[in-house]
Amino acid sequence: MYTSEERCNQRTQKRKIYNVCPQKGKKIFIHVHAITQIDGHIYQCLECKQNFCENLALIMCERTHTGEKPYKCDMCEKTFVQSSDLISHQRIHNYEKPYKCSKCEKSFWHHLALSGHQRTHAGKKFYTCDICGKNFGQSSDLLVHQRSHTGEKPYLCSECDKCFSRSTNLIRHRRTHTGEKPFKCLECEKAFSGKSDLISHQRTHTGERPYKCNKCEKSYRHRSAFIVHKRVHTGEKPYKCGACEKCFGQKSDLIVHQRVHTGEKPYKCLECMRSFTRSANLIRHQATHTHTFKCLEYEKSFNCSSDLIVHQRIHMEEKPHQWSTCESGFLLGMDFVAQQKMRTQTEELHYKYTVCDKSFHQSSALLQHQTVHTGEKPFICNVSEKGLELSPPHASEASQMS
């Protein structure tokens, strides 16, 4: 396989052999493998029959056929056909956007991206989706959009056979196999596989929250979180369960809910092989293997503080509310309700649910509240075998469906 430079050298040698065109009496230079020059001006690629006025343009065309990409990025080792493409690409790493819109001051890495954007100001939206009527400034954007209706995913990963509707999504996915993370934060040097991940991360340093709700003035760093929040106001629940037709505002809530029907428990404890429907439940469970509560009278240990309390009541034969502070730092002698009230007054609400913005003192309370949204009933009554969300009257009778 010849490089474009070698082909160019061969063309120069061939020109000394073929001198005159028999039809027009003008000079004609022919390279039998790649190129024909007619009238000293037209260069034709014999692979695709495309004509060019300049030899350099022909070389660029040849590289699309040979796959040759001689220009390499020093930051991520990506290669390009033209030096101009490399220069445009390097602006991503340098966060440089030299092409500014005079109408709204938006900036872009490439002049073509600016041209496409400017059509939105001129009202020129030439490409309309026949299915939903949405307009686009470029035909390529319409083509990608239509795949959301057809379900077409033409970009296939050769490693795991996963398909994607966009080539950029495939490129990003491949990095999960290679471990490549070309986008680096200049503040903390943390690296990311996708540019959007880097942009979102940088907002943790700048404090920027560009997505603002016009209903309640809440703001968000991530567009996805903002979209989910807006559904609180609109009541929209686009994710529907195929088994019971219950609807949800978040896809993650639907996935968790569907495990009620399928019985799937993908989160497994490697210590005892117990399985759970939620990752949060697994994390909470794993703490039982690492934290123990010791009895001061006997050398017996418990995984839960509540088990220790019950044990102490049995062997001490004392009223439970007369105990002093135990070794683990809990006020066991206090009435539980009074203790919870004190926590409410003194502690901040650390656990917040993004769907309805309710906050809780404990992660367990947040997990129980989430079942209101997901419809999940992870506990079963030993007497009636009825599924429960762990309501107080049944709490003592309930055993977790692990």
UniProtKB/Swiss-Prot annotation:
Assembly and partners? Answer: Interacts with POU5F1.
Q: One Pfam annotation, family name?
A: zf-C2H2
Provide the primary localization.
cytoplasm
Under Gene Ontology molecular function, one entry of this record is: DNA binding
Q: Where are the zinc fingers (C2H2-type)?
A: 43-65, 71-93, 99-121, 127-149, 155-177, 183-205, 211-233, 239-261, 267-289, 293-315, 351-373
Compartments reported by the entry? Cytoplasm; Nucleus
List the protein's name.
Zinc finger protein 322
This protein's GO cellular component annotations are: centrosome; cytosol; nucleoplasm
The membrane spanning regions, by residue number, are: none
Residues carrying Phosphoserine: S391
Supply the SUPFAM superfamilies for this chain. Answer: beta-beta-alpha zinc fingers
Name the family the entry cites: Belongs to the krueppel C2H2-type zinc-finger protein family.
Task performed by this protein: Transcriptional activator. Important for maintenance of pluripotency in embryonic stem cells. Binds directly to the POU5F1 distal enhancer and the NANOG proximal promoter, and enhances expression of both genes. Can also bind to numerous other gene promoters and regulates expression of many other pluripotency factors, either directly or indirectly. Promotes inhibition of MAPK signaling during embryonic stem cell differentiation.
Q: Which UniProt keywords apply?
A: Activator, Cytoplasm, DNA-binding, Metal-binding, Nucleus, Phosphoprotein, Repeat, Transcription, Transcription regulation, Zinc, Zinc-finger
- InterPro entries to which the protein is assigned, alphabetical: Znf_C2H2-type (IPR050758), Znf_C2H2_sf (IPR036236), Znf_C2H2_type (IPR013087)
Q: Give the source species.
A: Macaca fascicularis (Crab-eating macaque)
What other facts are recorded? Answer: Significantly enhances POU5F1/OCT4-SOX2-KLF4-MYC (OSKM) mediated reprogramming of mouse embryonic fibroblasts into induced pluripotent stem cells, and can also substitute for SOX2 in this process.
